[in-house]
A protein has these predicted regions:
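Surface-exposed patches in mature extracellular/periplasmic domains of secreted proteins
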Residues: 66, 100-119, 190-199, 221-225, ...
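Acidic/His/Gly-enriched intrinsically disordered linker/tail segments
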Residues: 192-270, 279-320
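Zinc-dependent metallopeptidase catalytic helix centered on the HExxH motif
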Residues: 137-220, 225
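Amphipathic alpha-helical coiled-coil/heptad-repeat segments
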Residues: 3-81, 94, 99, 113-117, ...
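Extracytoplasmic/secreted proteins, especially bacterial periplasmic and envelope-associated proteins
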Residues: 15-18, 22-25, 42, 46-49, ...
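Zn2+-dependent metallopeptidase catalytic core
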Residues: 80-120, 124, 132, 165-166, ...
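Active-site rim elements
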Residues: 7-10, 84-86, 240-248
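Sec-exported extracytoplasmic/periplasmic mature domains
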Residues: 28-32, 52-55, 59-62, 98-109, ...
Length: 320
């Protein structure tokens, strides 16, 4: 469990920080000219004990049998790249993502555990940089369970902190994208979106791109296949489609569709895509079609009606 590992490391670091602060206090006391030789000896002995305690913590703090602060290849954190990724997760990537999701989408997780894995998945550099996986009910109703965030270290190396990676696929953006999936998995009837009869993967991926913005990706797609090519991707969305393609251009089209829906909701007096998310969260059995209908005040009867409008008018929206 990645979160538990981070908590273990955080507790050990807090203890070492306390010892270092005490050593600093002792050094200041030792500089006082009124100290006798025996006083200075006592201060030095206490400092030595604190140093030994720091060394003990650094060599004995473990998680699942691995030394957390062992900087050798034998430790899960011995790899400096893995250590940097864990540092990025602990010092901003996760917190920033959760904060953005709460602010802009109005949803948060339900407190269920989520594993973070650095070594269980890889498809090589340039493939899937990270993914969230979970068990979706076969009835296509309800939340996902056993949710895991799996990071492909081949795409996170070198980590290039603090943002990580390079434009437009910065590591912190990738984590934000995946955390949208993780939170949606545990905050709504996510299983209904995986039903092959409706296939609403476009919304899952478009919303995940929308949280951090994907204009750079969209511009790259336009340069490659043109606005018409992007819109052709949109014709596969929903029940009329042939399933999610998964290419960068598919993500561009999905992102644009969510942007279009966001604007349509605002034009109807709502606050945007947040209204869809909040509706799904507050109505645990609701489907995306019902949420879109409610958020737009009935402008769209269902998700397919929205898709039809987007296919017809999305090109002008992109160009405009």
């Amino acid at each position: 469990d990645g979160i538990s590992m981070l908590q273990t490391a955080d507790g050990a670091l807090a203890s070492m920080t306390s010892s270092l602060q005490r050593i600093r206090e002792l050094s200041i006391q030792a500089a006082n000219s009124t100290n006798s030789a025996s006083d200075k000896k006592a201060l030095q002995e206490e400092a030595n004990q604190l140093i030994q305690e720091i060394e003990r913590i650094s060599t004995t703090t473990t998680f699942n049998g691995d030394r957390i602060f062992d900087f050798t290849g034998s430790s899960v954190l011995g790899d400096p790249d893995k250590l940097a990724v864990v540092y990025g997760l602990q010092n901003g990537w996760l917190e920033q993502a959760e904060s953005q999701i709460q602010e802009y989408f109005g949803i948060s997780g339900d407190g269920a555990d989520m594993s973070i894995e650095l070594t269980t998945f890889t498809d090589g550099a340039g493939g899937t940089a990270a993914r969230v996986v979970g068990s979706v009910p076969g009835s296509y109703t309800g939340k996902a369970t056993d949710v895991k965030l799996q990071i492909d270290m081949s795409d996170f190396t070198p980590p290039n902190l603090p943002n990580g990676g390079s434009a437009p696929f910065y590591n912190d953006r990738i984590i934000s994208h995946e955390m949208v999936h993780a939170v949606m998995y545990r905050s709504m009837n996510i299983a209904s979106m995986f039903d092959p009869a409706v296939d609403q993967t476009w919304f899952l991926e478009g919303a995940a791109e929308f949280i951090h913005g994907a204009d750079e990706r969209l511009q790259s797609s336009i340069s490659s296949i043109g606005i018409g090519g992007v819109m052709t991707k949109a014709t596969t969305f929903g029940s009329a489609g042939a399933g999610w393609g998964g290419t960068s251009d598919d993500y561009s089209a999905a992102y644009t569709a969510v942007r279009y829906l966001h604007q349509a909701i605002k034009d109807n007096g709502g606050s945007g895509i947040k209204d869809v998310m909040v509706y799904l969260n507050q109505n645990q059995s609701a489907t995306l079609s019902q949420a879109i209908n409610a958020a737009t005040g009935g402008v769209y009867a269902d998700a397919d009606a929205f898709n039809a409008d987007f296919v017809a008018n999305g090109a002008a929206f992109i160009a405009g």
